[in-house]
From Swiss-Prot:
<comment type="pathway">
    <text>Fermentation; pyruvate fermentation to lactate; (S)-lactate from pyruvate: step 1/1.</text>
</comment>
<comment type="subunit">
    <text>Homotetramer. Interacts with RABL2/RABL2A; binds preferentially to GTP-bound RABL2.</text>
</comment>
<dbReference type="GO" id="GO:0006090">
    <property type="term" value="P:pyruvate metabolic process"/>
</dbReference>
<dbReference type="InterPro" id="IPR018177">
    <property type="entry name" value="L-lactate_DH_AS"/>
</dbReference>
<dbReference type="InterPro" id="IPR001557">
    <property type="entry name" value="L-lactate/malate_DH"/>
</dbReference>
<dbReference type="InterPro" id="IPR015955">
    <property type="entry name" value="Lactate_DH/Glyco_Ohase_4_C"/>
</dbReference>
<dbReference type="GO" id="GO:0030317">
    <property type="term" value="P:flagellated sperm motility"/>
</dbReference>
<dbReference type="InterPro" id="IPR022383">
    <property type="entry name" value="Lactate/malate_DH_C"/>
</dbReference>
<dbReference type="InterPro" id="IPR036291">
    <property type="entry name" value="NAD(P)-bd_dom_sf"/>
</dbReference>
<feature type="binding site">
    <location>
        <position position="138"/>
    </location>
    <ligand>
        <name>substrate</name>
    </ligand>
</feature>
<dbReference type="GO" id="GO:0070062">
    <property type="term" value="C:extracellular exosome"/>
</dbReference>
<dbReference type="GO" id="GO:0005739">
    <property type="term" value="C:mitochondrion"/>
</dbReference>
<feature type="binding site">
    <location>
        <begin position="29"/>
        <end position="57"/>
    </location>
    <ligand>
        <name>NAD(+)</name>
    </ligand>
</feature>
<dbReference type="Pfam" id="PF00056">
    <property type="entry name" value="Ldh_1_N"/>
</dbReference>
<dbReference type="GO" id="GO:0031514">
    <property type="term" value="C:motile cilium"/>
</dbReference>
<dbReference type="InterPro" id="IPR001236">
    <property type="entry name" value="Lactate/malate_DH_N"/>
</dbReference>
<dbReference type="Pfam" id="PF02866">
    <property type="entry name" value="Ldh_1_C"/>
</dbReference>
C-alpha cells in the first residue's frame, strides 16, 4: 500500500541537494544566534549550518530555529559538532571564543582565543576552501590576523567585523544629538574595534554639510558642546551593555547581517571592516585594522584611500601600535 506522501506527491525529477548560498555560523552563543536570526529574517541564505561543541545547546538552537521555518525563507537549517556540516559554505562566520568578562578589555581576551582559532580554522578551510571567513570573535582585529595566517586564504577573503558596529553606534549617537535618523548621519570610525578606535570628525556630515565647517572645534577638547563625548560613549557602549545584561548580541548580529548582505549580493558597499593595512598610512607591520573597504562577492575588493588629517593619522598609528604590542608576542 502506498504512503500518504506517495499518494499526494509524484516526483518528476531528483532534488538538487547542493545549496547555492550556504552560510555557516561557528559558535551558538548569544552573538552567534543573533547573527543567525538576523540572517534568516533577511533571507540571505538557502542553507544555514550551526557548529558548536555544546551538543545539547546546539541541537536546541537548531530545533528552535527550524520550528520558525514558516516565518522565513531559508529551506534548510542543520547543525553539528563536526565541521563536515559546514561543507561548501559561501561564508563562514566565526563567533566562537571566550566571552568578554565585565571590565575585561578586548585585548585581554586574545591569548585565550588563539587556541580556539587553531582548533577550528583548518577544518573550515578543508570543507569550504572557496569561502569567505568573517571573524566576529574578540579581540577581532588580532584574531582576524591569526585566522588569516592559519587559514592560508587570500587576505581579501578573511574579514573582521571590525568598526562596522562602532561606526553604527557613532552614527546613532550623532543622530540622537541632532534629532536626525542615523541613516542620514554620516561618520566613520576606523582603527581598532575597541579602546583605541579613531573617530573621523573631519568627515562627519548630514546631507553633505560637514559639521566641522559649522564648528571647527567639533570633536576636540575645546568643543563647548562636548561632541567628543560621543566617541567616548561608543568605546564604553560594550562595557556598559555587558555590565547591564552580561553580553552584547543584537547590534553585532545586525551588523554582521549587513556585511553578509554586501558580500553575498555583490553590493560593493563601503564598510569599515578589519583588513590588512600594511603599507597604508605608514604602517609597516602585518596588522588588521578597520578602514573603509568595498565588499562584494570576492570579499574585500578595494579599499578607500581616506585623506586623514595629521591628528587622525597620528591616532590611527597609535591604534596600530596598541595592537602590535600585543600581536608581536603571540605564540600560535
Amino acid at each position: 500500500m502506498s504512503t500518504v506522501k506517495e499518494q499526494l506527491i509524484e516526483k518528476l525529477i531528483e532534488d538538487d541537494e547542493n545549496s547555492q548560498c550556504k552560510i555557516t555560523i561557528v559558535g551558538t552563543g548569544a552573538v552567534g544566534m543573533a547573527c543567525a536570526i538576523s540572517i534568516l529574517l533577511k533571507d540571505l541564505a538557502d542553507e544555514l549550518a550551526l557548529v558548536d561543541v555544546a551538543l545539547d545547546k546546539l541541537k536546541g538552537e537548531m530545533m528552535d530555529l527550524q520550528h520558525g521555518s514558516l516565518f522565513f525563507s531559508t529551506s534548510k537549517i542543520t547543525s553539528g559538532k563536526d565541521y563536515s556540516v559546514s561543507a561548501n559554505s559561501r561564508i563562514v562566520i566565526v563567533t566562537a571564543g571566550a566571552r568578554q568578562q565585565e571590565g575585561e578589555t578586548r585585548l585581554a581576551l586574545v591569548q585565550r582565543n588563539v587556541a580556539i582559532m587553531k582548533s577550528i580554522i583548518p577544518a573550515i578551510v578543508h570543507y569550504s576552501p572557496d569561502c569567505k571567513i568573517l571573524v566576529v570573535s574578540n579581540p577581532v582585529d588580532i584574531l582576524t590576523y591569526i585566522v588569516w595566517k592559519i587559514s592560508g586564504l587570500p587576505v581579501t577573503r578573511v574579514i573582521g567585523s571590525g568598526c562596522n558596529l562602532d561606526s553604527a553606534r557613532f552614527r546613532y549617537l550623532i543622530g540622537e544629538k541632532l534629532g536626525v535618523h542615523p541613516t542620514s548621519c554620516h561618520g566613520w570610525i576606523i582603527g581598532e574595534h575597541g579602546d583605541s578606535s579613531v573617530p573621523l570628525w573631519s568627515g562627519v556630515n548630514v546631507a553633505g554639510v560637514a559639521l566641522k565647517t559649522l564648528d571647527p572645534k567639533l570633536g576636540t577638547d575645546s568643543d563647548k558642546e562636548h561632541w567628543k563625548n560621543i566617541h567616548k560613549q561608543v568605546i564604553q557602549s560594550a562595557y556598559e551593555i555587558i555590565k547591564l545584561k552580561g553580553y552584547t548580541s543584537w547590534a553585532i548580529g545586525l551588523s554582521v547581517m549587513d556585511l553578509v548582505g554586501s558580500i553575498l549580493k555583490n553590493l560593493r558597499r563601503v564598510h569599515p571592516v578589519s583588513t590588512m593595512v600594511k603599507g597604508l598610512y605608514g604602517i609597516k607591520e602585518e596588522l588588521f585594522l578597520s578602514i573603509p573597504c568595498v565588499l562584494g562577492r570576492n570579499g574585500v575588493s578595494d579599499v578607500v584611500k581616506i585623506n586623514l588629517n595629521s591628528e587622525e593619522e597620528a591616532l590611527f598609528k597609535k591604534s596600530a601600535e596598541t595592537l602590535w604590542n600585543i600581536q608581536k608576542d603571540l605564540i600560535f
